């Protein structure tokens, strides 16, 4: 017969194995949620039969038209990127619903009991047969209809919760209408700091020095998602920025694959600087990268600008003028 101590040890080992096996996940703040929603809409609305109608529905939290692949895949995109659907397990993750609420409930209006109900509903759904858009959508659609008020609340779409969050966090998070670049500069090159004198040349694609520059590049690379959650280089995201300005991404993909294979750095800041140097050192890439990076700065002010029609058709001269205006404010 096992002793109580041995049962306790087995229980601890079992829990440890479960924790180790489970993918790491962090609750999502308003900036992250807006980024996810905008990207999923950008990806799937063009594939709808009526893109404008689909976008209008999705922005109003209506998963319609429900029989279209675009809506089903948009739904899966949202659930998977937020982390409420885990493809490795083929199931909805109730524990993450609770973690989201526990992390941010001081800002939100969600009722605790209703959050528990939503958590239980997720957990009672058995693992799916596949991670296809239709299977994920069909597993989730009734949950969405029944618990929409709670879902919106824990995802900062309940009125003023996002506003409370942004006010509380201040300059520590990217504010609405602020570019990722300016946000990172204000943290790592603040007014009055010794490194502030370097900011003007840094904004003109010259390399900065020391830890402040490493911190700045890490912040920007994370903000524009050139780094993923594990601080690994996301070459597809860099390539996407090239296509946004009408440039072929083949050269930059090859250059960054080569750079990635040679980089030995593990510190995220030093690694970001190494990758940035690679982008500026390759004569086949540098000019197009600078153009793409400028445009990314402008687009990072408003994640919804492209899908709402607020983003003007791309013009290199117009973007350069906007960036020059920002430079003029920073170089004083």
Swiss-Prot record:
Tissue specificity field: Female mosquito salivary gland (at protein level).
Pfam families linked: PBP_GOBP
Location(s), subcellular: Secreted
Signal peptide coordinates: 1-21
GO function terms (MF aspect): odorant binding; toxin activity
Binding site for leukotriene E4: 61, 176
InterPro entries xref list: PBP/GOBP, PBP_GOBP_sf
GO biological process: sensory perception of smell
Assigned protein family: Belongs to the PBP/GOBP family.
Name the record gives this protein: Long form salivary protein D7L1
Organism whose genome encodes this protein: Aedes albopictus
Underlying gene: D7L1
């Amino acid at each position: 017969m096992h002793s109580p101590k041995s049962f306790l040890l087995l229980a601890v080992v079992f829990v440890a194995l479960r924790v180790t096996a489970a993918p790491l996940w962090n609750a999502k703040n308003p900036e992250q949620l807006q980024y996810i929603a905008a990207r999923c809409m950008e990806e799937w609305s063009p594939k709808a039969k009526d893109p404008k109608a689909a976008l209008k529905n999705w922005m109003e939290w209506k998963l319609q038209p429900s029989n279209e692949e675009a809506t089903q895949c948009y739904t899966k995109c949202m659930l998977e990127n937020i982390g409420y659907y885990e493809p490795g397990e083929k199931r909805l993750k109730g524990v993450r619903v609770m973690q989201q609420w526990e992390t941010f409930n001081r800002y939100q209006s969600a009722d605790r009991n209703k959050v528990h109900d939503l958590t239980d509903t997720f957990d009672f759904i058995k693992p799916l047969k596949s991670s296809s858009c239709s299977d994920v959508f069909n597993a989730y659609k009734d949950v969405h209809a029944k618990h929409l008020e709670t879902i919106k609340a824990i995802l900062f779409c309940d009125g003023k919760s996002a506003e409370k969050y942004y006010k509380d966090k201040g300059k520590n998070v990217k504010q609405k209408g602020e570019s990722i670049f300016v946000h990172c500069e204000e943290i790592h090159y603040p007014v009055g700091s010794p490194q502030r004198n370097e900011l003007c040349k840094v904004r003109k694609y010259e390399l900065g020095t020391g830890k402040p520059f490493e911190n700045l590049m890490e912040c920007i690379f994370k903000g524009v998602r050139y780094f993923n959650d594990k601080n690994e280089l996301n070459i597809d995201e860099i390539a996407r920025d090239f296509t946004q300005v009408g440039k072929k991404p083949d050269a930059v993909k090859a250059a960054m694959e080569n750079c990635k294979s040679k980089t030995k750095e593990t510190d995220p800041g030093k690694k970001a600087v190494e990758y940035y140097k690679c982008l500026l050192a390759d004569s086949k890439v540098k000019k197009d990268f600078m153009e793409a990076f400028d445009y990314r700065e402008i687009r990072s002010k408003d994640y919804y600008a492209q899908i709402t029609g607020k983003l003007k058709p791309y013009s290199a001269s117009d973007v350069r003028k906007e960036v020059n205006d920002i430079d003029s404010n920073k170089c004083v």
